Amino acid sequence: MLDELRCEACSAGAIGLTSEEQQQLLSELDGWALIHRDGIAQLEKRYRFKNFKQAWAFSNQIAELAEQEFHHPAILLEWGNVTVTWWSHSIKGLHKNDFICAAKCDALT
């Protein structure tokens, strides 16, 4: 399972995932979407909560996860919602690390 894996170091020379690899890994996740923003493939999901405090607490859990994996998402915190977007900045696209971290986010809920 993806949430049991660890991220590997990803440098600018790393190779991004093919569309087929992205689709295969996406099939292992629940509720995540492949999007393109500014021409960059990204992985995104919105989590819903009963209030701002729960959403904030979840955002903090993701921040801890990001520090542990040394891989950092964009996090949008709103009342009752947290939108998490993963992509690998160094390769301007998706790497297996993004799918690993997405699965780890789901494991937090």
Curated annotation (Swiss-Prot):
GO biological-process terms attached to the record: tetrahydrobiopterin biosynthetic process
InterPro entries (alphabetical): PCD_sf (IPR036428), Pterin-4-alpha-carb_dehyd (IPR050376), Pterin_deHydtase (IPR001533)
Protein origin, superkingdom: Bacteria
UniProt-listed Pfam families: Pterin_4a
Keywords per UniProt: Lyase
Keyword Lyase: yes
Gene Ontology MF terms in the entry: 4-alpha-hydroxytetrahydrobiopterin dehydratase activity
EC annotation from Swiss-Prot or TrEMBL: 4.2.1.96
Reaction it catalyzes: (4aS,6R)-4a-hydroxy-L-erythro-5,6,7,8-tetrahydrobiopterin = (6R)-L-erythro-6,7-dihydrobiopterin + H2O
Tagged with keyword Lyase: yes
Family from the record: Belongs to the pterin-4-alpha-carbinolamine dehydratase family.
Stated name of the protein: Putative pterin-4-alpha-carbinolamine dehydratase
